[in-house]
């Protein structure tokens, strides 16, 4: 048997505390920092490490040629309302594509040389990297998966239109080509708008490739739209991640230093460092010099503000509490029905696991900060009747059955009316008629032999004579 005396007592007490920590109880550590903030590791995030590029190429010169052809034909030969409507619609759709006019004739051509980034969601590093690869060799460097089928009309449209010149149904053929071309321009406009918003465009993927794309990866997609001045082409690219890396993140928590100053910081985001740059959990590069220096463990250039309190008890996470400049206080611990009292003071970090604690009449628990979610529906559930698909023959049969039922009901009602009339005419009315005849005979007899009866007469209102007007 060991006696807890002398130097063994504090060592044994420390051992008991450590055992309690690893036994899912409570952990209390000193905070030794004088920076004005604390750094906490947060949940790791999945960051794309490599991408697969899917693109759509649009030849602006060929679009201009096709538009000019339609315009010339409308000026000379054809004035069908459908053709004029579609042509005007094409011009409206092209006007929505926000590119500069090269000249009066061109709708969306631009003068320049090489590739230029128009818009998208690439950061500066990705943009520069992709532009270099495009300038060197698009096919070998970026490995674009092109969808030439999507612009098949533009590639061979002129040949088809020339073949229709000798056809008697040229109006119908021209109308059909206009419809196809209009649909293509609408797809082009939609593709550019989705690229501007950073949304995935399914038209940039063949069905077989779309099957192999992870939906989670699509959420991390990047988009870019480029203009190739040399070939007068617009290039719309979807950058779909094919590999994701798990990276730990760091959260910055303001915490007073020994002089009572803490970091002037209110953001709740977490950050990570990659290739000497700092990003937030949305994978966007952080430009704040204060934050980037803190994450990189450099001398931060930040603003600090004084705290206006003598001591602090503060939540950090649902299971973590920090204290600052705390006077000696009793911490009541309730872990798995084991109740203890612990004296704490100063700057401490308290981690709770499956426990409840009380400090200065403030109760804390591991799940105290987790929100209670009310799953009560905000609407009255609908009683939905299952709909059965009815065929044509079934409908005819149902109508026939309903008609038969209606006829039967009508016949029953008619028979009931006839029976009721017969009953009233020949059965029920006869006693009443006999009674009426007897009463009439008795009345006649009373009139022939009047009897002295006292009848109380009901007084009538007095009738005053009229007074002639005085002349």
Curated annotation (Swiss-Prot):
Acetylation among keywords: no
Disulfide bond annotation, renumbered to this chain: none
Keyword Cytoplasm set for record: no
Keyword annotations: Glycoprotein, Transposable element
Glycosylation-annotated residues: 3, 59, 167, 325, 363, 383, 403
InterPro entries: Retroelement_env
Superkingdom, natural source: Eukaryota
Listed name of the protein: Retrovirus-related Env polyprotein from transposon 297
Annotated source species: Drosophila melanogaster
Protein's gene: env
């Amino acid at each position: 048997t060991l006696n807890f005396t002398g130097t063994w007592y504090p060592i044994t007490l420390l051992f008991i505390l450590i055992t309690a920590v690893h036994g899912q109880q409570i952990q209390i550590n000193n905070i030794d920092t004088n920076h004005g903030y604390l750094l906490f590791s947060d949940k790791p995030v999945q960051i794309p490490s490599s991408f697969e590029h899917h693109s759509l190429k649009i030849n602006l010169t060929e679009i201009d040629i096709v538009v000019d052809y339609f315009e010339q034909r409308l000026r000379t030969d054809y004035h069908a309302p459908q053709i004029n409507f579609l042509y005007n619609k094409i011009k409206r759709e092209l006007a929505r594509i926000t590119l500069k006019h090269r000249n009066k004739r061109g709708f969306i051509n631009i003068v320049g040389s090489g590739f230029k980034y128009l818009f998208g969601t690439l950061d500066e590093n990705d943009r520069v990297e992709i532009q270099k690869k495009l300038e060197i060799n698009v096919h070998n460097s970026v490995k674009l998966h092109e969808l030439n089928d999507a612009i098949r009309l533009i590639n061979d449209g002129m040949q088809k239109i020339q073949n229709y010149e000798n056809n008697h149904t040229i109006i119908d053929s021209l109308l059909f080509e206009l419809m196809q071309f209009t649909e293509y321009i609408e797809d082009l406009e939609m593709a550019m708008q989705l690229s501007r918003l950073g949304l995935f465009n399914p038209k940039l993927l063949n069905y077989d490739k779309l099957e192999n794309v992870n939906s989670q990866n699509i959420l991390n997609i990047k988009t870019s739209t480029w203009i190739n001045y040399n070939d007068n082409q617009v290039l719309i690219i979807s950058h779909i991640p094919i590999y994701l890396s798990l990276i730990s993140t760091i959260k910055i928590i303001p915490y007073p230093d020994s002089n009572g100053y803490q970091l002037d910081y209110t953001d709740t985001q977490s950050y990570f460092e990659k290739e000497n740059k700092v990003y937030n959990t949305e994978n966007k590069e952080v430009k704040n010099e204060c934050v980037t220096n803190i994450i990189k463990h450099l001398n931060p250039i930040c603003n600090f503000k004084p705290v206006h309190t003598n001591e602090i008890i503060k939540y950090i996470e649902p299971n973590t509490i920090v204290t600052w400049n705390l006077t000696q206080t009793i911490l009541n611990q309730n872990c798995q029905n084991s109740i203890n009292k612990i004296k704490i003071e100063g700057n401490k970090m308290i981690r709770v696991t499956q426990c409840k604690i009380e400090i200065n009449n403030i109760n804390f628990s591991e799940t105290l900060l987790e929100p209670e979610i009310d799953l009560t529906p905000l609407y009255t559930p609908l009683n939905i009747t299952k709909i059965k698909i009815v065929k044509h023959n079934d409908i005819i049969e149902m109508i026939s059955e309903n008609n038969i039922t209606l006829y039967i009901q009508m016949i029953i009602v008619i028979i009931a009316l006839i029976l009721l009339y017969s009953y009233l005419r020949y059965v029920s009315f006869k006693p009443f008629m006999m009674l009426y005849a007897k009463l009439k005979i008795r009345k006649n007899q009373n009139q022939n032999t009047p009897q002295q009866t006292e009848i109380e007469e009901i007084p009538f209102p007095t009738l005053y004579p009229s007074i002639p007007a005085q002349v």
